[in-house]
Amino acid sequence: MEKHPADLYKDHVRPFLYSKLEEFKILGYDDVELESLWSYLTDKKWKKKTELSIYELASDILSVKIGEFMNYATVESFKTSNWLGSEEGQEALEELLR
């Protein structure tokens, strides 16, 4: 996996990441992990940015909405899921096509 320019500052913004994870827990999303939040930020929020300052990173982290993150997480889970390739998935597909 290619390193993102923001990875240099990950340790500096870690308190902001933990703060956002705590906010998600208060909203009932206990299973969000730091790495998945970081992946969302580097893959979506900062995808095309090559130069970032720490205050921009902190602001972007604190402005993440749970809906935006969950949309990203859902799409990523579909991308990595091989359910249709499984026997159970094939049976369900055949049942739908009858």
Swiss-Prot record:
Annotated InterPro entries: Post-transcriptional_regulator
Knockout-associated phenotype: Disruption results in severely reduced transformation frequency, but has no detectable effect on either the frequency or the location of division septa.
Keywords (A to Z) from UniProt: Competence, Cytoplasm
A GO BP annotation: establishment of competence for transformation
Record bears the keyword Cytoplasm: yes
GO CC list: cytoplasm
Cell location: Cytoplasm
Domain of life: Bacteria
Function comment: Required for post-transcription initiation control of the comE operon. Promotes the accumulation of its target comE mRNA to septal and polar sites.
Subunit details: Interacts directly with DivIVA.
Protein name in UniProt: Post-transcriptional regulator ComN
Source organism per UniProt: Bacillus subtilis (strain 168)
Upper taxonomic lineage: Bacteria, Bacillati, Bacillota, Bacilli, Bacillales
Gene that encodes it: comN
